[in-house]
Amino acid sequence: MKTTVTDALYAGCEAVVKIAWLNGLWLLFTLLGGVLFGWAPSTAAMCAVIRKWLMGQKDVPIFSLFLDTYKKEFLKVNAIGLAFSALLLILSANYHYFSASTNWLSFAVTSCTLLAGLLYIIALMYVFPLYVHYQLPLRKYIPQALLFGAMRPLTTGCMLIGCGFVLYLLYTLPGLIPFYGPCLFGLVLMFFALRGFQKTEAQHHQAG
């Protein structure tokens, strides 16, 4: 019994340290890329490591896998990252400009912008798990992210709820943000996304 408890405590402490280490790598390489050019490859590299963990490869070399993914995918994944950055600027500008007015046109544009914002969030939740799990043409990742979000509403809902819980946790304990913030979101998104992918693949095999 003591051995079991000791092993569980050791495994828990090891997991906490690994998550903090991965989160530190995300922060470091995001800054090395000047944030704008660093956040997307860092996120893809983080998701690649988490994917291995969730698939049972607990002893994967974190730094080497992170660095290899970051360097290998830097240009390609930055195309996705820059697209999301540009879309965020456009959506934010639209919302701030039109929400200040009260006429019907401004209301319609603001409503459409909010709907587009929801689609943006759904695509952003899925695109990096998709990127590290499937090899697709670059132009297909964002449409496929939206498609998965629509095909798997339960998975999408779980992702939103999970991210909401992480936001609440980080709001309550802000000291966790520099050590665990991005990685906690990555764990939640990869956990639910992988299960959604596996269910979709199983359905395709049954249909085939």
Curated annotation (Swiss-Prot):
Reported induction: Up-regulated by growth on type I rhamnogalacturonan.
Pfam families, per the entry: DUF624
Protein name: Uncharacterized protein YesV
